[in-house]
């Protein structure tokens, strides 16, 4: 199981969790977080979101095209490993949301 802290404007908003065994993903807002939602599709009022595939909002933070190819090649990341891709670029995303892997 891999986890990543998710920040909105530098404030920790919640955690993204990848359950590789069951091939599922969850995003959970921190109980004390009362800032803006990280996405209009993920309101703060609902504290937990579950996905069968990599969450669309986080997929939208990933590089595409030439930038994706360079990332996969230089970091030796599998094309199907969206979580690792996000960890590689998570602190340098476009917009207010950043992501940082939780060390084991």
Go through the PLM ranges and name each one.
Residues 1-104:
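Phosphate/dinucleotide-binding and metal-coordinating scaffold of catalytic cores
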């Amino acid at each position: 199981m891999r986890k990543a802290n998710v920040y909105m404007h530098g404030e920790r908003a919640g955690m993204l969790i990848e359950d590789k065994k069951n091939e599922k993903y969850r995003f959970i807002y921190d109980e004390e977080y009362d800032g803006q939602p990280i996405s209009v599709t993920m309101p703060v009022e609902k504290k937990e979101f579950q996905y069968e595939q990599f969450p669309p909002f986080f997929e939208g933070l990933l590089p595409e095209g030439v930038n994706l190819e360079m990332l996969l090649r230089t970091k030796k990341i599998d094309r199907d490993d969206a979580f690792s891709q996000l960890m590689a670029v998570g602190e340098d995303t476009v917009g207010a949301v950043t992501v940082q892997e939780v060390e084991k």
